[in-house]
UniProtKB/Swiss-Prot annotation:
Ranges that cross the membrane: none
UniProt keyword list: Cell membrane, Cytoplasm, Membrane
Function: Component of a complex required to localize phosphatidylinositol 4-kinase (PI4K) to the plasma membrane. The complex acts as a regulator of phosphatidylinositol 4-phosphate (PtdIns(4)P) synthesis.
Entry similarity comment: Belongs to the Hyccin family.
UniProt biased composition (Basic and acidic residues): 393-403
Stored InterPro entries: Hyccin (IPR018619)
The protein's assembly and partners: Component of a phosphatidylinositol 4-kinase (PI4K) complex.
Pfam families: Hyccin
Gene Ontology CC: one annotated term: cytosol
Name by which UniProt lists this protein: Hyccin
Polar residues bias spans: 466-484
Amino acid sequence: MLAMDQGVVEEWLSEFKTLEETAVYNYAVSLKEKGSLVPALYKVIRENYSDLLEPVCHQLFEFYRSGEPRLQRFTLQFLPELVWSYLSVTAARDPHCSGCIEALLLGIYNLEIVDKDGQSKVLSFTIPSLSKPSVYHEPSSIGSLALTEGALANHGLSRVVYSGPHLQRETFTAQNRFEVLTFLLLCYNASLSYMSGSSLQSLCQLSSRVSICGYPRQQVRRYKGISSRLMVTSEFLVQLITGIHFALCNGEVDLGSKALDDVLYRAQLELFPEALLVGNAIKSSLHGASLKSNKEGTRSIQVEITPTASRISRNAVTSLSIRGHRWKRHDAVDLGSPDELTEIAEVDEGICTQASGAQSSPPTIVISSSAGGAAAGAGKLAGKGLRRLTGRSSKEKDKEKDAATGMDQLTRKQAAVRAMSENLELLSLKRLTLTASQSVPKSGSLSLSRTASAVFSRSFEQVSNVFSGNQPSSRASSPTSNHVAEQDEGVAYLDHISPAHQHRQRSPTISIHVTSDL
């Protein structure tokens, strides 16, 4: 240390001792005019065996205890260098050199954790709501509440505590060391806009050294200081990243970029998710051109306070709008022309139109629910289908009359119809379509999954070329599927009376009628 720097420090030490209380404010303002004082104090702090280190630490503590904001900020600007000096001495296991620095750090910590009344200080913040005006976002159109002092005081939003209450510490231990240092960095970051360029550089150097010491990257950075690894916590790295972000946006691009990379390097090794999240978010938002152009001027972080375009939807989705919302049916059809009526009748009533072409549509399964018996449900289904068909041409009405005489013949072909329905079920697995006749069973009715499982649990081994004209083999029916067989009779009946529609190549349909009397 040069004699000139030593003289500047000694003069500074003697001035404050003889200062009256009324002249403290003027003295705090005049400290900015002493340009050689700050570099000289940095040299004293970096020399662990300097004779001036203990009186300097005592003077800095007196500055902070005075309560003058300017004097407190003057002490805080040396905090990164003080933290590094303490950690390096601790890693070297030489506690005799760090006694005064440790006392200064603990003194600042104990002063900051309490308020003016001596009560524990709790730091908290309020999460803004999109439904209410706020200084954090655009006012939404949900309400027209004026942003007044009374509205902010009675906003009704919960506050989230992010620091405190903290316990007083009399000495550093391995358990509370980084708890104290993290809180001190939090206080430092609260005054970042008042920090000098040398303080921001010291913060970046602290971040790099703490992160790389004892790791292979130390050789890349060519740092020849201590080579032992320093234990860190995720919260400590997050506070370092916060200060680095400010330094990046205020002229320290090179040092800040290296420090951010080093902290992310250490966070990856330690698997700290909080530090990785914050660091990668800041790294992704950086723009080199805008940072370099901000070398001189007002020190601030570049943020967009008032967006130029609206980014909040005016039609906000709330619980009320969700309850009042009704899903549109995917299969809604306008009942206009007779052809559309024919298509609805075939789909809703379970009409199975046999496809004779090679390019036939895949089969369709129609599921419906009813509270009546199985036979009554089949009769209602057939009757409803006939009523739908009466709205067609006169030829179709004649066909319906002729079809009435064929009901007796179909009863003798029940076994063949069951075999054909099994083949249709096998084909329906390729494409399962729930049509407009699907409905949810009411309470007391048979479970849809139970009835469907009874139908689909039958063996699919009997596969025959139904659409090629082959005659299916007869098979005895089980009691579980009697109502399905009766439903299939109605399907086969409508298929039998409508041979003119075979050229349309409609997809075959299976109608499963769910009843509650089983």
